[in-house]
Amino acid sequence: MPEVVDTCSLASPASVCQTKHLHLRCSIDFTRRVLSGTAALTIQSQEDNLRSLILDTKDLTIEKVVINGQEVKYTLGERQSYKGSPIEISLPIALCKNQEIVIEISFETSPKSSALQWLTPEQTSGKEHPYLFSQCQAIHCRAILPCQDTPSVKLTYSAEVSVPKELVALMSAIRDGEAPDPEDPNRKIYRFSQKVPIPCYLIALVVGALESRQIGPRTLVWSEKEQVEKSAYEFSETESMLKIAEDLGGPYIWGQYDLLVLPPSFPYGGMENPCLTFVTPTLLAGDKSLSNVIAHEISHSWTGNLVTNKTWDHFWLNEGHTVYLERHICGRLFGEKFRHFHALGGWGELQNSIKTFGETHPFTKLVVDLTNTDPDVAYSSVPYEKGFALLFYLEQLLGGPEVFLGFLKAYVEKFSYKSITTDNWKDFLYSHFKDKVDILNQVDWNTWLYSPGLPPVKPNYDMTLTNACISLSQRWITAKDDDLNSFSSADLKDFSSHQVNEFLAQMLQNAPLPLGHIKRMQEVYNFNAINNSEIRFRWLRLCIQSKWEEAIPLALKMATEQGRMKFTRPLFKDLAAFDKSHDQAIRTYKEHKASMHPVTAMLVGKDLKVD
């Protein structure tokens, strides 16, 4: 088979050389907003007569490159937009196959690094100390340090990080001690070790006034002190989720499973950084109702972090399997009907994404072609929900959940510590179900994997928990003005928060509604008083799409007081599409841009066609 090319990386491919270990020594400078230090990369040649190699960098200043104590020649290539600049390093000796060399690169990041957000004290809960966090997925690790920034290469790492002594540093690794910085009594050095090989997008760092509380035998929850108690309560189910995940996926090999609750500008719901999952504070609903995100990040400890997509074209392998595991964890905890309820909700989200892109858009394919495309721009619910739908469909085709979970466990065992493509997955599926090849051959593989739009088949879903949401949404959609008095707060008295959210998702698929309906909905249900972020998000979108001017300040507030892109991007888009809030939306974006996460700022700017 031809070699799979990672079009998102400018570095030498895994077939030429492979980074085996990184030792990072760095110092965090909050005044200049830079990370500076040395990255010592242990690189193994994969061919004979290797005389030079290329690494990814982005907005890095390179001070020198040293091999065996000697400075060597290097060339920093021209910037290639979102891909950054390749650095070509000349080797002092030609390497033969499997020979290893340590390359020590002294570097400094840019204050504009796309991987880092630097927060002022005012942007934190405590208001006293600055804060730094990283987000490397998909291709931002190169904006922190020179690397082969591709998920096809896995490495172990160790680190020593110097920070102001009143702050705490954490990484996606096992904590390995702390000591005063011998070079500066006002600083402290934190040490870390990650002994499981990982793709470099899983390297992560946070520095802030962090505290922790133990919530399980292998779990501390970390945050600023203002959020610690609330977070400990919200995520108390973590250990029971981990145990179920081990039952489904095999032993948890990472040792620690800590959680970090970040400041509100964190751009994602969660990030599966090994040993330290990062999560958004928008999960702090007060009733544990958004804990499926924790189940999702836990599941990545197997699908994504152990078995990894070889390139970002195959991102669905990470996310589809992880959503599949996540929903099984929630099913074990809350019942099979609940699993089906969320599965069907996911199909609705897939419909929304396809409607947003357009049904022929290439980003609606399961396997995408990211040649000359920034993965951040292509990102959507498609790899998650189209991927899940394929696995859920296969489950139903091949004999049910137990049968398919058997496949999943075997898949994890087969491909642990490797990076794979969709073809590798499909070949293994066929070999695992070799007695059911006739059934597998009924699958319209080409449409499922490589065609845009909705899948060719919709799986079967148990409707028990969804029916109440549908019937209430249908009542509202069909109601005439005279019927509005028939609604009351009693409509929702038997609804879980998940069902309230699904009801609003149904309404949103039928937006806009007459303004009178929206005002009546607020009168009887008082949705403005609900702080659950998922419910509030859908309610405010429904209000803006139905052109309720009174909701404009509330929607602008939600779009800016947190930065989870799932919420911020659609809210800004809806506000910009409403003539009464268009100018205000653009003005608000411009005012907040400098304090937004760099990726969020870039994508909202694209959405609003600003810049």
Swiss-Prot record:
Phosphorylation at Ser-416 inhibits leukotriene-A4 hydrolase activity. activity. Zn(2+) binds at H296, H300, E319. A peptide binds at Q135, C136, Q137, P267, Y268, G269, G270, M271, E272, R564, M565, K566. It is found in: Cytoplasm. Bifunctional zinc metalloenzyme that comprises both epoxide hydrolase (EH) and aminopeptidase activities. Acts as an epoxide hydrolase to catalyze the conversion of LTA4 to the pro-inflammatory mediator leukotriene B4 (LTB4). Also has aminopeptidase activity, with high affinity for N-terminal arginines of various synthetic tripeptides. Monomer. This is Leukotriene A-4 hydrolase. The lineage of its organism: Eukaryota, Metazoa, Chordata, Craniata, Vertebrata.
